[in-house]
Amino acid sequence: MTQTLYDKLMNAHVIRRDNSTELIYIDRQLIHEVTSPQAFEGLAIAGRKPWSTSANLAVPDHNVPTTNRSSGINGISDPISKLQIETLDKNCKTFGINEIPMNDIRQGIVHVVGPEQGFTLPGMSIVCGDSHTSTHGALGALAFGIGTSEVEHVLATGCLWQSKSKNFNIEVSGKLNKHVSAKDIALYIIGKIGTAGGTGHAIEFSGDTIQSLSIEGRMTLCNMAIEAGARVGMVAVDDKTIDYVKGRILAPSGAKWSKAVEYWHTLHSDKNAHFEKIAHFNAKDIKPQVTWGTSPEMVITIDGYIPNPANAKNHTEKVSWENALNYMQLTADIKISDIKIDKVFIGSCTNSRIEDLRIVASVLKDKKIANNIKLALVVPGSGLIKKQAEKEGLDKIFINSGFEWREAGCSMCLAMNADKLKVGERCISTSNRNFEGRQGQGSFTHLVSPAIAAASAITGHFSEVK
């Protein structure tokens, strides 16, 4: 019987089936400071120990400051942020969980650190108390976000009851246009299928365009699968996947490596495997994208115009557009390139890897950011990425252009740490969400690729790469 990649991974981890749900074994769990305190507290109250300490890896990321790290935790000004990181440290020590602490050079965003360390491996089932866990599917893994109570359940038992998703194949074919990246592909797809297009499905991205992407690019794509409504996003294993994993600290070696690679080569959908839903896109139709509203599906090309609600396809969409225009303080039918921006954020679990930073540096080299830009940040996804960028001299390009070069963390992706927008500020961001107040109360977020963020920083308004 032919199987999709998702079917293969689910079947490989099923312990028991019960009507419409399946009890599956969880190979790895990533933990951060926001969704874990109650889970550890539940273990303590019940007097339980973790099923497998080695199956878990913790790293603080949401609340960590991206400046003034020399004082450690005591340097965190916000008492709640400080408490959450202190609590993670304490819980990991109490329960024997391996943690990469705040000032360790390996620290970073959990969805960057997992693959970087080799903790994320093809064929594994991977969970985290974070919706963007779908990122890890780029390595041919079964990865999805879970809630706090489920974090506790995985800690205690190493298992989870899950309802099986339907299969959705999104195929992208052809050569990408110049300056078009995985982020543009993701936003373009979401613009076409909507934020509910993948609801109830596991999305497998396929086609020669996807195969041409680096692993970093595939991570960006799978990271955004959740924004299309899917819980799971994945790409089949190929030689790029195996080359990426090889030699990483926690990856297998020797005879175990050879055995693993043999299995990993089977992690692709079989020919003629059944998908409940299929969508095809041509790469030549994809241009650099930018969101204009309060949902990732509210997206246009960088040379496009703000949509007019009068042209909405139905009443629901019309009202949604009107509300978005009102919140974003935008006027229909104006060219988006005429809109000025206040701040620029390059980072997040979507676009903070070394490939992203190299692209940004190539656009910024020998240029300065516009005078109207109040703040421009480049925040690497991990301390190791920061180290590599500095080795290549990218940090000097960022700083010379007027950007601030920060420490690793989630930073301005969400208003949970010191890096946030003020009321009325408009930000062009390489992150993944643009709902009301995401980057700060009363702020306006526009999602773009790293290249477009850098180009727009130079001109002070939404711009293509020149």
From Swiss-Prot:
Heterodimer of LeuC and LeuD. It is an enzyme of class 4 (lyase). Its EC number is 4.2.1.33. Belongs to the aconitase/IPM isomerase family. LeuC type 1 subfamily. It catalyses: (2R,3S)-3-isopropylmalate = (2S)-2-isopropylmalate. Its cofactor is [4Fe-4S] cluster. InterPro entries: 3-IsopropMal_deHydase_lsu, Acnase/IPM_dHydase_lsu_aba_1/3, Acoase/IPM_deHydtase_lsu_aba, Aconitase_4Fe-4S_BS, Aconitase_4Fe-4S_dom, IPM_dehydratase_rel_enz, IPMI_cat. [4Fe-4S] cluster binds at residues 349, 410, 413. Catalyzes the isomerization between 2-isopropylmalate and 3-isopropylmalate, via the formation of 2-isopropylmaleate. It comes from Ruthia magnifica subsp. Calyptogena magnifica. Pathway: Amino-acid biosynthesis; L-leucine biosynthesis; L-leucine from 3-methyl-2-oxobutanoate: step 2/4. Keywords: 4Fe-4S, Amino-acid biosynthesis, Branched-chain amino acid biosynthesis, Iron, Iron-sulfur, Leucine biosynthesis, Lyase, Metal-binding. GO terms for molecular function: 3-isopropylmalate dehydratase activity; 4 iron, 4 sulfur cluster binding; metal ion binding. The keyword 4Fe-4S applies. GO terms for biological process: L-leucine biosynthetic process. It comes from the Bacteria. This is 3-isopropylmalate dehydratase large subunit. Binds 1 [4Fe-4S] cluster per subunit.
